[in-house]
Amino acid sequence: MAKGSWFFIILFIISMLENMINSLELDRHSFPDDFIFGTAASAFQYEGATSEGGKSPTIWDHFSLTYPERTKMHNADVAIDFYHRYKDDIKLMKELNMDAFRFSISWSRLIPSGKLKDGVNKEGVQFYKDLIDELLANDIQPSMTLYHWDHPQSLEDEYGGFLSPKIVEDFRDFARICFEEFGDKVKMWTTINEPYIMTVAGYDQGNKAAGRCSKWVNEKCQAGDSSTEPYIVSHHTLLAHAAAVEEFRKCEKTSHDGQIGIVLSPRWFEPYHSDSTDDKEAAERALAFEIGWHLDPVIHGDYPEIVKKYAGNKLPSFTVEQSKMLQNSSDFVGINYYTARFAAHLPHIDPEKPRFKTDHHVEWKLTNHSGHIIGPGEERGFLFSHPEGLRKVLNYIKERYNNMPVYIKENGINDNDDGTKPREEIVKDTFRIEYHKTHFEELHKAIVEDGCDVRGYYAWSLMDNFEWEHGYTARFGLYYVDFVNGLKRYPKDSVKWFKRFLKKSVVGESNKEEVEEMSRAEGNKTFKGFEESAGFFASFMAMNQSRRDEENNRCSFDFPHTHFGVLQGIENPSSFY
């Protein structure tokens, strides 16, 4: 055979090898060895047992029971009954090969009155100790959130909850008890979950507890001021965070090897018109309010200048002492990333209808000026997949906050269930598999190509659960929960995918490394001869046969075009996502 023929054959083999190596899907071994993979939950959405074990009502108990029409006529009295079933659910986490479980502590279960002077509920303490021990016994690390929107209703009745500065010292006491009781076994802590969502949805839009807003914004709101209350609540939330961190760093059980941070919920924003300076600046303002409003204070001790400019005198200020307490009060930042929007400059707002949502002169849109949608969505109306936004958010934090450590504390997508879909259809969640797959790809790029210091990823959520104002109609779980027939758990197809992705001993992984080493030894550009090249190719094929067989058995992905029906008509969904 002529030399030229050998040359083209070798080039063909090299091309085949390169394509095959590049086509190998990511799995847990694609990430750093100490990278944490987990799943997440919250007390109110999971536990149930609202009147058991000494627990008092929370603001969400009050909200869902007093205004049932605002939560799809659903409540979380039982939720998914995690309070009684946690041992079985932890077994499912272990089967999924999860490293960690993020959950929140119910303030009302630990200190029913909300005030330490009235005593600590020993039964509540024991429940969380038992939960922690069960996790550790299954080699799952607990990650505890102090506050996931469910403070005792008694504090709301007494002084308005987070509308009052009194909440700060009560939260400090609650946090201190948590550190003293659980700090010897829990090393990962977060203070406040999604302060942006809590304040905006609860006090500007009024569609989440405490359900306050201006009457013209939402006629269901009984009281509130959408113009001022979000800033007040957010301010007290930040001070409560700082107080908790101060206690954390004084506590002997947590001060040496524990870490603590705040959890934010940023969307990514692209300019509505890519050539418009106004829209580019609008996107920057949107990010400043979504991220900087809460991250700047816990890093630098003060609000961003752009937030001060647009919020004006409605934005409270920190004292010198408060600023000092806030500065560097987050060892890491937790990010709950779900979706993205286009941002358009809003030149005029109605002075007769002031509210937080319009203060920064930004209008959120699902489509840009040419009609291009931000990403595939479904008939849920509030989540549209935009995985590249995750990478951009991580780089935004890297560039503006000195590449501080990041944990993805929530990421997931829901399936809308109006009661007409059979279980057999819902468990075929190929769209969820593709959602996680594409977000892992962008996360991997952020870490490997961009150098972002991301240290963990928690999927939302293990189980379908009570999804706030959506009740049980928005299913985020990897496991289907039958809310009609005894809360039985059924694995969705995404469970099978996650088991493969998180497998701790993957057949063929070492072979991949061996192939890469062989390629380097051969120069990967030229081979000594066709015989060696062909032998190498045959070796590669043999070593990866098991992986190819497994790939052939994977679910086919019909996302995004066939499984998602885009909801074109909703530009500003009321939901927090």
Curated annotation (Swiss-Prot):
Q: Which domain of life is it from?
A: Eukaryota
Known EC number(s)? 3.2.1.21
Q: Which cysteines are joined by disulfide bonds?
A: C213-C221
Enzyme class of the recorded protein, top EC level: hydrolase
Question: Which residues constitute the catalytic centre?
Answer: E194 (proton donor), E410 (nucleophile)
**Binding annotation for a beta-D-glucoside:** Q45, H148, N193, E194, Y338, E410, W460, E467, W468, F476
Sites carrying sugar chains: N328, N368, N524, N544
Entry annotated with the keyword Hydrolase:
yes
List the signal peptide residues: 1-23
Spell out the InterPro entries in the cross-references.
Glyco_hydro_1, Glyco_hydro_1_N_CS, Glycoside_hydrolase_SF
User: What reaction does this enzyme carry out catalytically?
Assistant: Hydrolysis of terminal, non-reducing beta-D-glucosyl residues with release of beta-D-glucose
Task: Please give the biological process terms from Gene Ontology that the record holds.
Answer: carbohydrate metabolic process
Q: Which GO terms describe its molecular function?
A: beta-glucosidase activity
What are the record keywords, sorted?
A: Disulfide bond, Glycoprotein, Glycosidase, Hydrolase, Signal
Q: Does Hydrolase show up as a keyword for this record?
A: yes
Q: Induced by what?
A: By sucrose starvation, dark and senescence.
Q: Which family does it belong to?
A: Belongs to the glycosyl hydrolase 1 family.
Q: What name does the UniProt record give this protein?
A: Beta-glucosidase 30
Which species is listed as the source? Arabidopsis thaliana (Mouse-ear cress)
**Species lineage, top-down?**
Eukaryota, Viridiplantae, Streptophyta, Embryophyta, Tracheophyta
* Name of the gene encoding the protein in the UniProt record: BGLU30
